[in-house]
Swiss-Prot record:
GO terms for cellular component: cytoplasm. This is Threonylcarbamoyl-AMP synthase. Keywords: ATP-binding, Cytoplasm, Nucleotide-binding, Nucleotidyltransferase, Transferase, tRNA processing. Required for the formation of a threonylcarbamoyl group on adenosine at position 37 (t(6)A37) in tRNAs that read codons beginning with adenine. Catalyzes the conversion of L-threonine, HCO(3)(-)/CO(2) and ATP to give threonylcarbamoyl-AMP (TC-AMP) as the acyladenylate intermediate, with the release of diphosphate. Belongs to the SUA5 family. TsaC subfamily. It is an enzyme of class 2 (transferase). It is found in: Cytoplasm. One of its GO terms (molecular function) is L-threonylcarbamoyladenylate synthase. It catalyses: L-threonine + hydrogencarbonate + ATP = L-threonylcarbamoyladenylate + diphosphate + H2O. PANTHER family: SUA5 (PTHR17490), THREONYLCARBAMOYL-AMP SYNTHASE (PTHR17490:SF18).
Amino acid sequence: MTDTLDLDRAVATLTQGGVIAYPTEAVWGLGCDPRQEAAVLRLLEIKRRPVEKGVIVVASSVDLLRDWVDIDALEPARRQDVLASWPGPHTWILPVTARAPRWVTGEHDGLAVRISAHPVVAALCAAWGAPLVSTSANLAGEPPARSRAALDPALLATIDGVVDGETGALAQPTQIRDARSGQILRD
């Protein structure tokens, strides 16, 4: 059985390169330290997701993302739209800086980021104090889990712990919109 982690143990697990599961706005997510290449590659291997696709990164504030994204490169109106939507269930593709790691961006010139208002995600990000990978807790091509009970036992056997809680009220995973063009990539 996978351990249930309080916030302190979750932070310790992330620091050690671990992969954890936690509830998000609509589905359960998998997370790890995006600054640790080995942790991200392990998470992607668990999901059977190609590194080329990139991952979503969540944080407790925009300032924690500034090393990797250049929000100031956006047109002022688009930048205002992004900032006004956070914290909240809005994932935006932002232009990346040269420091954004390829194991996070994949083959893209943007990075999907969110400042979440979900209580568990917000508390985890605040306690962690750094960006966190947030990708659905399922194998690639399988439906995402909407409850802890729905998490795949085989997936649970490969991760390092679970932060308990309930998913939010969204019926679908968060919309993903490119902040540069306004194009909706996932609705």
